[in-house]
UniProtKB/Swiss-Prot annotation:
Record keywords, A-Z: Cytoplasm, Gluconeogenesis, Glycolysis, Isomerase
Protein name: Triosephosphate isomerase
GO biological process, one term: glycerol catabolic process
Lineage, broadest ranks: Bacteria, Bacillati, Bacillota, Bacilli, Lactobacillales
InterPro entries in alphabetical order: Aldolase_TIM, TIM_sf, TrioseP_Isoase_bac/euk, Triosephosphate_isomerase, Triosephosphate_isomerase_AS
Subunit note: Homodimer.
A GO MF term: triose-phosphate isomerase activity
Keyword Cytoplasm: yes
CDD domains assigned to the protein according to its UniProt record, in alphabetical order: TIM
Organism: Lactobacillus delbrueckii subsp. lactis
Gene3D superfamilies: Aldolase class I
Length: 252
């Protein structure tokens, strides 16, 4: 089973529409063929329109950084997955550690979002990962497995086959500590085994698993050489055209 690698930039709360267009213009002619590597940028909601228009006709795929689990209604400040689909967005990040931590999103919330995203024909990029405290207590696998089980509750094997899961060790984000490629591979393997236990081998072989935790041009090749790592969810390095291009063109 050969899984198409997927490198997704997560811009977080950075970039305005003008900078977005400048970024796309700088990268769009140098992106790999999507059958070789899928290049994605997940941008703030206020930049999505500019991003989609600028990326039109290129190999750049567009993702949102969040959405709500209802398509419409009295939910001030939320983003509709149905409207994201209508706009041409393909991916939505859910369960990011910043959403879990700062906005107190629970696995139940994330599960509802996953169902709504699939119901609207979009693909979730589901984040999971442990804190330093949990890692130091030796409970990281237990923690991540419990997240995956709760987040995938009620999803079909057909849906999970299309899913992207991003492992982000929270302790390796902005702490100066880095997960080694072996540590990253070990957890990505555990995630794949968990999907196999919950569903079946075929589903586990289809699901694409990214590593997210200080991914940069200097370590992308080493990470992508690992059998269970199918891509990267990239923060800071995705904001600069040159480093983003170095990441998506890591095979060259």
């Amino acid at each position: 089973m050969s899984r198409t690698p997927i490198i997704a930039g997560n811009w977080k709360l950075n970039m305005n529409p003008k900078e977005t267009v400048e970024f796309v213009n700088a990268v769009k002619d140098q992106l790999p063929d999507p059958s070789k590597v899928e290049s994605v940028i997940c941008a703030p909601a206020v930049d999505l329109d500019a991003l989609l228009k600028a990326a039109e006709g290129s190999n750049l795929h567009v993702g949102a950084e969040n959405c709500y689990w209802e398509n419409s209604g009295a939910f001030t400040g939320e983003t509709s997955p149905a409207v994201l689909k209508e706009m041409g967005v393909q991916y939505v990040i859910i369960g990011h550690s910043e959403r879990r931590d700062y906005f107190h999103e629970t696995d139940e919330d994330i599960n509802k979002k996953a169902k709504a995203i699939f119901a609207n024909g979009l693909t979730p990029i589901l984040c999971c990962g442990e804190s330093l405290e949990i890692r130091e207590a030796g409970k990281e696998k237990e923690w991540v497995v419990s997240q995956i089980k709760a987040d995938l509750e009620g999803l079909t094997s057909e849906q999970v086959s299309k899913l992207v899961i991003a492992y982000e060790p929270i302790w390796a984000i902005g702490t100066g500590k880095t997960a080694s490629s072996d540590q990253a591979e070990e957890m990505c393997k555990t995630i794949r085994e968990t999907v196999k236990d919950l569903y079946n081998e075929e589903t586990a072989e289809n699901v694409r698993i990214q590593y997210g935790g200080s991914v940069k041009p200097a370590n992308i090749k080493e990470l992508m050489a690992k059998p269970n790592i199918d891509g990267g969810l990239v923060g800071g390095a995705s904001l600069v055209p040159d480093s983003y291009l170095a990441l998506v063109n890591y095979q060259d």
